[in-house]
Regions:
Chain A
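Alpha-helical transmembrane segments and their membrane-interface boundaries
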Residues: 1-189, 205-215, 449-466
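Intracellular, membrane-proximal regulatory regions of polytopic membrane proteins
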Residues: 1-36, 42, 180-191, 202-387
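Aromatic- and histidine-enriched alpha-helix N-cap/loop-to-helix transition segments
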Residues: 56, 298, 302, 389-392, ...
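Extracellular/lumenal glycan-associated surfaces
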Residues: 91-92, 306-308, 400-402
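Membrane-helix cytosolic exit motif
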Residues: 207, 403-413
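Long amphipathic all-alpha helical oligomerization modules
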Residues: 350-398, 412-466
Length: 466, 466
């Protein structure tokens, strides 16, 4: 029993020493981690750094009220309200800042006026009852305004205003009990608040402004284009892999799909709310149809949702007849192209006319696949059973893509997108690709040619793609 | 030309009169609409009304500082900070209120201490440079803290604290330039803030407290149970309709599915963040595994997402072989039962052991369906093609339900759910129903009995359900 004890002691000592030695390095490692995260945040969106500098600048500017004797003599201790306003009101986007300024300004004015009225009423009611009457007023308005904050519309846009209303009403009405010069004080405060708010607005709008509307516009476009990329590249890889070699599938695009599904809803709604406060800027008018972006966003999410089950099938080695694979691949790649055209139309604010032929192709491809499956079902059954889930996802997706197309068309009418000058180069190479694909299919299975014969009523433009 | 003009004039007059007459009724109608909405909000969750009354009570209580002479003499104009604290800090849930109180309190203390230190440094640097040094400090801290607010973790839990830090640091350090009794002033403010915050906390916790953790717990359970109901009832209706008469499908459950998909994510994350601030209460310990609820919520959303395409098939009249319909119906109803058992386990905080047999049944049903489809595919092809999309959705869903089961099991281990005292009555009637269903199938198609023979290795419990 002596041996183990002896050898244990030094181990404990060594462990203790190691633990002790690591103490300074642990917080250092953490600090390094934080620094790395900070650099990533700044690289990811440099506007964050600019925003921080803008806040610093504005706070320092407003502090001048304290440093400069003549200004301070006029405003006194109320000057602190200017600093307060800046810190509380300065938001990342112009819309956020304007919204908070308006909320704060209007709520302060309205609440102060009402509170002075309430004070007057209380004085009229007689000296003794004054505190009770004012207490009653304060109670009633606090209850009412707290309840109004639960209204969904108020919560989305005027929550801050309601808070300031309760605050100002309470402060002004109870101050009236003690300070007789309440109006003079309120004046000084109001002036400082206006100074703070206007400095804020000036810095926010004039120096590298961040427009929530522009962010929303880009974000919705980016999501559609990500979905399009996913469809084009990812599905391509998926089919290549089953026919060619085992190519490593790039996982990032799947996680992109997930981020569209999960995070976009809240972000889009916030941005649309903020964008509503913004004046016209750049290509956007004052009443740009921001709500329509939410509709497009919802449809994009729906489409991503319908694509989600596809992940499960990607890992299985698909062994379906070549011509069915071809049709499915065609539909996916057409969807991808449609979505990318739509995203491009949103981005450049041009009419999405170039997406229309893709949508037509898509409908044709989807119909063709259905016909093919019905006629081809006499083939190897287990293979067809394997491919059917993907075909189902595809059919769902096609209707989703069509809906997105309609919604973008509506947007282009509402926001008066400009017409595009034609470019037809991109399309040609794709047609060649699809034709190849069909020729392989035609050679292999006769039922396909029957399916094609059934569709002779289609226009020449569509027939190329059948 | 005289005739129409004559008849037009009175029309304009009448229209004008009608428009004029409607003026008072329009705002009245709007007011009535708002009142109706308010009543609905209060009925929907009476805690909203109680919260509003609590806010009113607390604001009025704190206003007493102004009414009572001895209190006012001690605190002076700083008493307004108490009102301010109450209005800004009082949140709907206990977690929100505690979080804001801690954020406000700690940030104020830290910022005030640092600002006093900065002031001291500035004084040491010599009288002339003082404003510049302080201006530099204010600038640096405002930039740094504004940037720190972009860190996702900080944004989720400490955003308000960061705001208060910037505010307090700026106010205290620039006040130091003017007011020599800055420490005395800070003391009075701190006391009033503590008074405001403690009144807030007392009212919030002692009178009808709203626990964010409890809300999260119930909400996650409710979503799972809604999904279970949707599966059981809705799918039942769907198949009844195709075989029996055209029964009206109740749409509300589809919209429930949508609300799970769209709104739950943000709400769950907010509640989990708030729940993190709450002390132990009722059945929940201080460190209840709130994060696990987020995981369960994510899986529930995934399951709802996979079910979403089913809506498109509900409107088509399904005409598949009876025994396949039976299998699918069985799988959906088993999933429904599993989910409802899991929801019940969460709700009552008991171990979800009663869900396990359902999960086993579910796996069996899913396997059986696959076998059946493979063997039964020689039947009427167009019918099978019609049923396959639903079968695909079902397979996806089964794996989702299994994952939810695993996650709930994990939760029950982490949160030490109590074991359940057995109840076996519910299950029996279901077995009878399923048996019926199988007997119909058995009579019609021989391939099913082969499928069943293949599975003789299952336990007796499972065989009843095959």
């Amino acid at each position: 029993m002596v041996g183990p004890e002896n050898s244990e002691k030094p181990t404990i000592l060594i462990r203790g020493w190691l633990w002790f030695r690591d103490i300074p390095s642990k917080p250092l490692a953490k600090l390094r981690g934080v620094a790395r995260q900070a650099i990533e945040l700044a690289k990811d969106d440099p506007r964050r750094l600019i925003h921080s500098l803008k806040v610093g600048l504005t706070v320092t500017l407003v502090s001048l009220l304290y440093y400069l004797q003549p200004l301070y003599n006029n405003l006194g201790a109320s000057a602190m309200w200017a600093v307060m306003t800046v810190v509380v009101v300065f938001e990342f986007s112009v819309g956020g800042t304007i919204g908070k300024c308006l909320n704060r300004g209007l709520a302060t004015l309205a609440a102060a006026a009402l509170a002075l009225g309430a004070n007057h009423l209380a004085i009229l009611s007689g000296g003794e009852n004054e505190p009770y009457v004012i207490g009653l007023f304060v109670f009633i308005q606090a209850v009412a305004m707290s309840f109004v904050r639960f209204f969904p519309k108020v919560k989305a846009r005027y929550d801050y205003g309601m808070l300031i209303f309760i605050l100002t009403f309470s402060l002004v009405s109870i101050s009236g009990l003690r300070i007789n010069e309440v109006i003079k004080l309120a004046q000084a405060r109001f002036v400082t608040i206006v100074i703070g708010a206007s400095t804020c607005l000036a810095v926010c709008i004039l120096i590298y402004p961040v427009w929530a509307g522009e962010d929303l516009h880009k974000y919705v476009g980016k999501n559609i284009s990500q979905l399009g990329n996913f469809l084009e590249e990812h599905m391509d890889q998926c089919f290549k892999r089953s026919s060619d070699a085992r190519i490593e599938i790039t996982k990032p695009s799947i996680s992109n799909l997930n981020s569209i599904l999960v995070d976009s809803k809240g972000r889009e709604e916030t941005l649309a709310n903020l964008a509503g406060w913004e004046p016209g800027h750049g290509q956007f008018m004052f009443r740009h149809p921001w709500k329509q972006y939410l509709k497009i966003g919802n449809l994009t999410r729906q489409c991503a949702c319908r694509l989600e089950p596809i992940n499960d099938y990607l890992n299985s080695n698909i062994q379906a007849p070549q011509e069915i694979q071809c049709k499915i691949q065609e539909a996916f790649s057409e969807s991808g192209k449609t979505l990318k055209e739509l995203a491009w139309a949103i981005e450049t604010m041009t009419k999405p006319s170039s997406a229309n032929p893709h949508i037509e192709n898509l409908k044709t491809a989807s119909e063709n696949l259905k016909i093919l499956l019905r006629s081809g079902i006499k083939g190897d059954e287990s293979d067809i059973l394997q491919i059917i889930p993907i075909a189902v996802v595809m059919t769902d997706m096609v209707s989703s893509v069509e809906q997105i197309g309609d919604a973008v068309n509506e947007l282009s009418l509402m926001a008066k997108f400009k017409s595009k000058t034609g470019n037809g180069v991109e399309g040609e190479s794709e047609i060649g690709h699809d034709k190849n694909c069909i020729e392989i299919g035609m050679a292999e299975i006769p039922s396909l040619s029957v399916a094609i014969d059934e569709r002779t009523e289609f226009s020449a433009d569509e027939q190329i793609l059948i």
